Structures are given as C-alpha cells and as structure tokens.
C-alpha cells in the first residue's frame, strides 16, 4: 500500500511524464496538487481513505474548481467498505473519487471509467439514443425490451431518455439483447461548469467587490482569496493575499505558492497591503496598496497597474 506522500509523488510523476505542468505539492490544504495541460486543469486531493475528506474541505475544493474551470478529483486507496476498485468511480460530497490505477488509465491510455459505486451497488450511464435506435431496428416495443431485460416499461423509458442510471447487470443484459455497447464512458478530466460560486467578503479586499469582482474566501488554501469578474467574458482570476498584520518576512514566504499557483491556473497574483513601507512587490508578486485599490474606477486600471509592476521587477 502506498503512503500518501508516495502517492502524491507518483501522481506528479505520472502527470509530468504526459506533458502536464504541475504545481508544488500543498498537502495541508483543500487540494494537494494543481495540474494543467493546454486548457485542461485538474484540482487533485489525495487520501489513503477517501472517507477522510470532510464537507468543508470538499466545498472549498468544488468552489475553487468552479473559479478555475478545473476538474476536481479525489484519489485514494480505500474507503470504509474496502479497497477502491480499478475502473470504478466513487463519490464524496459530489466529487469523483478514484484509485491511482484508474487515474493512470485515464492519463496514459484515455481509458475512462464507466462504473459508479453508489448505495445499492454499481451503476452505469447508458446511451439512450443507442438503446432506442437498436430497439427499433429489432422491431421491439418499449415493453418488449423491458420484459427481456427484466425491468418495467417505465424504467426502460427512463433509460432511453437518460433519466436514470442502470445497474451493471441490466446494462450487460441490454448489450447482449441489442448486440451493441450501450454504456457511456465518464470523462472525469472534462470540467463540469457551474455558476454556483458562493462569493464572500474578505477583510482587506472588499474594494475589489466595488470593481465588479466576486471574491471567494479560502480557509484551507495557500492563498487568502481568489477574485473573478462577475459579469464578464474574461475568465481570468486574481489570486490574492492580504496583509492581516503579517510580517514582511511571512508575506514573502507566502509569495512562493502564490506565484506557483498563478502560473498553473493562468491567474494574476497580487498582494493587497496596508503598510506603505512595503514597496511595489513582494518576492515576485505585485503589491497593491489598500488606498490605491479605493481609487481605481474599473478593473482595467487595477490590471494595468498589476502588470506594470510585474514588468518592472
């Protein structure tokens, strides 16, 4: 059995070998690793036992995935019910959880899992169009096919309209009757876009809201907040740390993950600082003073200053 540190290293090695850019490892936060390949971003969290994740951790992970247009995935070894099976998706708080072998199959071979483990057994998503097409080719009514598959007509109707999932046994029977594949692969690497982001107030960054940014405060991430325009086609975001009476030494240390994660997520990193003694940058991160933030009339002015200070380093 892998320990968690070894698992994280193997995940990092796997992704980099396939051309992904990976962040540093942040194993104390709501995510451990962020990886990017072209437009695809993965937000990954590892547990030896996937039941170790709590609701607050999962919620923050999902919120960040929505902001970054990323796919959140939990990778683990086991659950309370036993070892995670290869090719099976488990869910915890609506986040897919898989074994390392399942991740490896997706990354190396583009072999995506079909089976979902849920209360009551194993289920698959079925292709309703394929079922209907082949049923009609065989001149079977809904009831005919339902009887052959040992389900009700209403259930068969739901399969054809993709309202419900089928258990694996029923899917196998359908494939045998229709002589074709009816199950659907589940591409966990493809993000599920959701607008359900719970923006909040962040002390020291409230003036970003006046510029039209929605701000997501974080508790378990290597940055204080992430800000994104609420009503714009511009999908880029700001990764933000605020002063919070921290020493300059502490802030400089915090600049390292801020820079690292901004590069992977294509975000603009910025410190929002009250202390006038601190110059226009900390480490390699631009600094915006709180009083400056109050004076900006639109986000373009803010972004212009951030980029100018970045260029002047």
Swiss-Prot record:
GO MF annotation terms: DNA binding; DNA-binding transcription factor activity
Keywords: DNA-binding, Transcription, Transcription regulation
Residue span, HTH cro/C1-type domain: 131-189
InterPro entries linked to this entry: Arc_TR_HTH, Cro/C1-type_HTH, Lambda_DNA-bd_dom_sf
Domain of life assignment: Archaea
Keyword Transcription regulation recorded: yes
Protein name, UniProt field: Putative HTH-type transcriptional regulatory protein Msm_0453
